[in-house]
Regions:
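A short SAM/SAH-binding and catalytic strip from SAM-dependent methyltransferases
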Residues: 92-108
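C-terminal lobe and adjacent flexible extensions of AdoMet/dcAdoMet transferase-like proteins
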Residues: 159, 179-217
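Short alpha-helix
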Residues: 143-170
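Class I SAM-dependent methyltransferase SAM/SAH-binding core
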Residues: 32, 36-84
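Conserved class I S-adenosyl-L-methionine
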Residues: 123-150
Length: 217
């Protein structure tokens, strides 16, 4: 695969890869779990940030906001950059589908936004490519950077989220085909899903001081 043009931003180059057959096979393999995420907290809106190839799903699953990566930040139902113009603790689920990165505009600040927007008990659904998969040769030169689950768990904890101990492997191993059946652990699958929950912080009980009586006059 040819390297992306130097004039293209990394977000745009990665987005273009997911519009090609190899990327679309990964997205199609994740479709059932994205649908599950959108219905994870009935009655609460969701936020779905990801490549445009699957946007036709969004209108069928309750109230939500659909954003796609763009050169200047985000496009879709809103044209904006971080911080997102959305109220804190108002979303039951946040789906980050192949948009989170180790650094830059889609790095830690994006995870912090996800944590801010989730209600206590809400969940982040993080879909990322697997750096150990043979399929990585298909995104070579696209500008996509990937990390193993252990690294992502550290990043999620750093923004106050509690990640699941086990991720789910998704997508093909090497052939460009849809492979939707998840497996425990990423293995050699093209991508994996890591979920993390926002826990409510318990109030620290205040120790009552013993009543001090003044001595009688």
């Amino acid at each position: 695969m040819p390297a992306p043009s130097p004039t293209r931003q990394p977000a745009t180059a990665a987005r273009d890869w997911f519009l090609a057959p190899a990327g679309r096979a990964v997205l199609a393999s994740e479709e059932a779990l994205v649908v599950q995420a959108l219905g994870d907290r009935p009655g609460l809106p969701w936020l779905w940030c990801g490549p445009a190839a699957g946007e036709d799903l969004a209108g069928d699953y309750g109230r939500g906001v659909r954003l796609v990566p763009a050169e200047a930040g985000w496009a879709g139902q809103l044209a904006c950059a971080l911080p997102l113009p959305l109220p804190s603790e108002s979303f039951g689920a946040v789906v980050l589908q192949h948009v989170a990165r180790p650094a830059g505009a889609f790095g830690p600040a994006l995870l912090e936004e996800a944590s801010r927007l989730l209600v206590p008990g809400g969940r982040l659904w993080l879909f990322v490519l697997n750096p150990l998969a043979p399929y990585r040769w298909r995104w070579r030169g696209s500008g996509i950077t990937t990390s193993e689950p252990l690294v992502w768990r550290r990043r999620l904890r750093a923004v106050g989220l509690v990640p699941d101990p086990v991720s789910q492997g998704l997508g093909p191993n090497w052939s460009v085909r849809v492979s939707a059946q998840p497996q425990q652990g990423p293995g050699l699958r093209a991508a994996y899903l890591l979920r993390a929950e926002k826990r409510s912080v318990p109030l620290t009980p205040v120790r009552r001081r013993a009543l001090q009586l003044a001595p009688a006059a």
